[in-house]
């Protein structure tokens, strides 16, 4: 009778019961959603993980691990000197639309918001370390209105919860904002 070690060796294993985990392959759509979320909220809360899992049709654990590995990749690249600590993307090889290259601070009075044209939310950079452009968490709802393709007018007509008296800044309400924007974008494209 063969021993368990012999049986696993016959299967091509190392003989010590090692089990190689199946590697997850993400679709382009899943990666786009994850990169967008990471660019806007690099430290998502549990409800954001749950929402991303639902949107991407991935298990929540896979979403959580993706964020952990994305951060590890950034730290590794910074330590090895591939990218400078101040930027995730080498300036000479990435091009973003002008409206997304110029920072817009909604608290600055008199500063006009970015152009009213539909902004592109994907980077044309081919570096895997360059996140898709998005909102920084401190921009909150004002920043979301600035990059929304419909502008600030009309958002409440599609989804009444989009217009609020106070800016949304907590991670829980940011998750709600992502969901609401997804609804508006889906309604707008149907």
UniProtKB/Swiss-Prot annotation:
<keyword id="KW-0804">Transcription</keyword>
<keyword id="KW-0221">Differentiation</keyword>
<comment type="similarity">
    <text>Belongs to the paired homeobox family.</text>
</comment>
<keyword id="KW-0371">Homeobox</keyword>
<dbReference type="GO" id="GO:0009792">
    <property type="term" value="P:embryo development ending in birth or egg hatching"/>
</dbReference>
<dbReference type="InterPro" id="IPR009057">
    <property type="entry name" value="Homeodomain-like_sf"/>
</dbReference>
<dbReference type="GO" id="GO:0003677">
    <property type="term" value="F:DNA binding"/>
</dbReference>
<dbReference type="GO" id="GO:0005634">
    <property type="term" value="C:nucleus"/>
</dbReference>
<dbReference type="InterPro" id="IPR042223">
    <property type="entry name" value="SEBOX"/>
</dbReference>
<feature type="compositionally biased region" description="Polar residues">
    <location>
        <begin position="89"/>
        <end position="100"/>
    </location>
</feature>
<comment type="function">
    <text>Probable transcription factor involved in the control of specification of mesoderm and endoderm.</text>
</comment>
<feature type="region of interest" description="Disordered">
    <location>
        <begin position="82"/>
        <end position="161"/>
    </location>
</feature>
<dbReference type="Pfam" id="PF00046">
    <property type="entry name" value="Homeodomain"/>
</dbReference>
<dbReference type="GO" id="GO:0003700">
    <property type="term" value="F:DNA-binding transcription factor activity"/>
</dbReference>
<dbReference type="GO" id="GO:0006357">
    <property type="term" value="P:regulation of transcription by RNA polymerase II"/>
</dbReference>
<protein>
    <recommendedName>
        <fullName>Homeobox protein SEBOX</fullName>
    </recommendedName>
</protein>
<feature type="region of interest" description="Disordered">
    <location>
        <begin position="1"/>
        <end position="24"/>
    </location>
</feature>
<keyword id="KW-0238">DNA-binding</keyword>
<dbReference type="GO" id="GO:0048477">
    <property type="term" value="P:oogenesis"/>
</dbReference>
<keyword id="KW-0217">Developmental protein</keyword>
<feature type="compositionally biased region" description="Low complexity">
    <location>
        <begin position="1"/>
        <end position="11"/>
    </location>
</feature>
<dbReference type="InterPro" id="IPR001356">
    <property type="entry name" value="HD"/>
</dbReference>
<keyword id="KW-0805">Transcription regulation</keyword>
<keyword id="KW-0539">Nucleus</keyword>
<feature type="DNA-binding region" description="Homeobox">
    <location>
        <begin position="19"/>
        <end position="78"/>
    </location>
</feature>
